[in-house]
Amino acid sequence: MIDFDVEPEFQKQIDWVERFTKDEIEPLDQFMSVGRRKDGSPLDGDSWGVIRRHMSNLKQQVKDQGLWGFHLGPELGGPGLGQVKLCLLNEKLGKTRMGPSLFGCQAPDTGNMELIAHNGTEE
């Protein structure tokens, strides 16, 4: 049987991700799925600029929590959480469209990051 219990400090991170997902990511997902203003008109370049700035702010909040690129091991600048903790975090983010992008763990970047880190050169 797999033990899914985690230490209290990590549970606080899971709880933060759950709140962040509900309060920030789900509304963004809803907006992005429509991609229009309240009056039904399509978004213009200025609107997308506002969205990009908002997403940058959300990414910074994730980084401030130490959860950016949480799938990476410590040798690549990540926390090296292990499979159970990865599963618990991905369970929360997998319910959203934009969550993985905001946490720096979206496909195909997750696999590519490791490949470049292990096989890339300075060039």
Task: Walk through the language-model features, giving the residues of each.
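Short, intrinsically disordered, charge-balanced linker/junction segments flanking boundaries
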Residues: 120-123
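Short, conserved phosphate-binding/catalytic loop or strand-edge motifs used
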Residues: 106-113
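Amphipathic, small/basic residue-rich leader segments at the start of a protein or domain
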Residues: 1-106, 118
